[in-house]
Amino acid sequence: MSSTHSNNVGHPQSSPQGPLTEQQRAQQQYQIFENSLPKVSQSVYQMLLNEMVPLAMGIERQISGDVISSDSNVTSENGNINNMIKRLKIEEHHTVDIIRSHNLIHELYKADEEEKEKVLARLRNIGFQIGLKLSELLIFSNNPNLKFKEMDLLLIMKFICRDVWKQIFGKQIDNLKTNHRGTFYLLDYDYRPIQSFSLEEDAKNEELKMIEPFLEIPVGIIRGVLSSLGYSSEEVICLASFIDRPTDRPKTAFPKGVSFHVQVTMPQ
């Protein structure tokens, strides 16, 4: 995909009356930084995010098949994940089975809990790595001395709701709720990657269950951002669930919103 840049970058603009404050200069510099970032097609980007789910299932399917076909006497040392991945190398002229994405998603829905959890963990890890990289992009690349750990946790969650979400999904979180004791609910009534999924308002639980894996990447993103700011995996619990959308919002093809429940263990 070729990247495009804003046509306005580099064009002179009229300066506001009077000298700029330090805050205004910082905002102006950050705007220039954002405009300089390469742009990609939003539709293609969301398709790429969604394809991570069947891809994760396909990898697990291949790993599982490789383990089953391997010698039953393989030692635990040779059976670790690194060796499994090495055995996945595609040799020259090797035929690869192509499975349609929707078949892999249905296969994931039918999988047992152990296999399903492996796939979901892989998706969360993808999101976690995105969160780490995004923190570096939005924070540390511009201000290495910024220490979020010294800030109020609520400000950090607002940063996720505003800056992180907008950078990844092109919109902010719609609502943030908290009890001010480490519990937060990030409510996205129009989570964009699943808006193209058409469901009836009275969608059955089975249909929603098949879509739940698509929520694991943003769960991982939240955990990754918090980890980069000093909150370890042991301190953070993050879960996602479908919720009813407010009645005053316009109807969309996907009738449910998403609630991201974040619990951060507060220091004593």
Curated annotation (Swiss-Prot):
CDD domains, A to Z: TRAPPC6A_Trs33
Disulfide bonding pattern of the chain: none
Main location: Golgi
Any one Gene Ontology cellular component term annotated for this protein: TRAPPI protein complex
Entry's transmembrane regions: none
Region (Disordered): 1-27
Source organism superkingdom: Eukaryota
Family per record: Belongs to the TRAPP small subunits family. BET3 subfamily.
Name this polypeptide is given: Trafficking protein particle complex subunit 33
Provenance organism: Saccharomyces cerevisiae (strain ATCC 204508 / S288c)
